Amino acid sequence: MAKMMKAAVVRQFGKPLVIEDVPVPVPGPGEILVKVMACGVCHTDLHAAEGDWPVKPSLPFIPGHEVAGVVAALGPGVTDFKPGDPVGVAWLHDACMRCEYCETGWETVCEHQHNTGYSCDGGFAEYVIAAAPFAARLPVGVDFAQVAPILCAGVTTYKALKETEARPGEWVAISGIGGLGHVAIQYARAMGLHVAAIDIAPDKLALARAAGAEIAVDARSADAVADILKATGGGAHGVLVTAVSPPAFSQALRVVRRKGTVSLVGLPPGEFPTPIFDVVLKRITVRGSIVGTRRDLDEAIAFAAEGKVRAEIKTAPLSDINTIFANLKAGKVEGRMVLEFAQAAKVRSEPGALAPA
């Protein structure tokens, strides 16, 4: 196996990523080395590269947390995988597994977690290290490029929909029909929910209808809230906000039903006003949701494996990463962008077929 690999490296916040040769990492105890076949590009990667959030990654680092690939090597003590197994590497690299959150199945809020492509190097590279207990098993025959977005956009929206506690036959409103929103619509429909989509762009509203939304509403319309209340018979039982827009957060509280739940995923800067009287009187629950647990990830992958969820993707080589970031900033990306490595994502996985030479 090669000793060096190509990677897109952040050396300065807010500056273009540098494509360079770096050493192939060596898996330690309990770790696996994954040969990256495809890696999705997420807004979180852009935030990481820009240094937007209060706790910043340590420079230099390699972003990327929607990794689909095959096991290339095993670290000491790993017995659950073998070379050539198709695996996914998601945002949650590992967690302590000892705190009250981990012990109750909430490793996503562990204060000692590490995150792929943020606090440890990610998948904008030919190889990446994964903690074996947190690597997701992918189905044999998987399309690597197609499954990559499920490892973040998929599990994030699936978990957030579960957090609304909406039941089959009830309504959810999904605000923001971009890379996350169009996937969320498909999960919602697969879960037996009716969907009202909210966005400000005509092309995104068209995407929402194509994905299965029963109604699609322009958020800027003076009648937007009234239209949703009427269509849903009094408001959505759950509202999922993926939009990176504070006004979308405020609008969500106006379209949710009494005793409904608003699940927040988007991470715009700043704050949003909360109508305390309405929240109290109508018993509205406002809940943040961050990615998903290992169980959530397995469930999200299962929906996709059954063909019930399929992200709209466009593929590009690693060398295009700075152009992709520029398009993300400008809001010019419809669906999800996925980096492919040496066209490897076009090869379907078979047992042993993709093991390293």
Predicted regions and their residues:
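NAD(P)H dinucleotide-binding glycine-rich loop of Rossmann-like/cofactor-binding domains
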Residues: K56, D94-S175
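Glycine-rich cofactor phosphate-binding loops and adjacent beta1-alpha1 units
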Residues: T164, P168, I200-P202, A206-T285, ...
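Short Gly/Pro-enriched turn/cap motifs at secondary-structure boundaries
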Residues: P23-V24, S58-G64, T116-C120, E126, ...
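Glycine-rich beta-strand-centered segment in the early N-terminal region that forms part
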Residues: P23-C39, D52-E100, P139-V142
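Mid-domain Rossmann-like dinucleotide-binding core that forms the NAD(H)/NADP(H) cofactor-binding site
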Residues: V87, V140-A222, A226-D227, L240
